[in-house]
Amino acid sequence: MKVLIISAEVWQDKTNGGNVLSNMFRNMDWEFAQIYCNPGMPDNMICKKYYQMTDGMVIRNIFSHKPVGKEFEYISGEKESDRREIELPNQKFYGFFHKHRLGIFYSAKHFLWNISNWKNENLKKFINDFSPDIIFAPCYGDQFMLRLTRFVGQYTGKKIISYISDDHYTLK
């Protein structure tokens, strides 16, 4: 079975969301791919195929028409310096917005994602090449993540499995 995971965070065993994914799927002999929407390098032993979209890519798309999204394969244990095409977190930039969780920032972010071309041929190629049997997408309290999940579900015609965690509907 091929499972396409759609999540906001990168799949790292050391983070809460990544640890949950690893614990859920560790003993399954399935093939996994992930679409994620934040900077960072994956680090897990389960998933090898990734498609990354970030706020920075969205901004570059709006101002310079560079495509949103990067497809890559990752083998656990690779050094971050070996993966230069992956967008890594800018702690100062993201730290500011994490510290100052104002509604205007969320509105601006969603506006930028809405006017960018994230539903592009690169994303469709990644989805087509992987050809998932099912889509697994945690249910976030985030308009864009819900829109992305809906798009992928409609594009593939595949069933979506989702769940709600206890901390996704608060700004704290």
Regions from the language model: what does each represent?
Residues 139-143:
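Short, solvent-exposed amphipathic helices
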Residues 74-134:
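Conserved nucleotide-sugar donor-binding subdomain of glycosyltransferases
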Residues 3, 134, 138, 149-171:
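Active-site proximal beta-strand in glycosyltransferases
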Residues 116-119, 146, 169-172:
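Nucleotide-sugar donor phosphate/pyrophosphate-binding loop at the beta->alpha transition
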Residues 1-80, 156:
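N-terminal subdomain of nucleotide-sugar transferases
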Residues 10-14, 110-115, 172:
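Short, flexible loop segments at the rims of nucleotide/cofactor-binding pockets, characterized by
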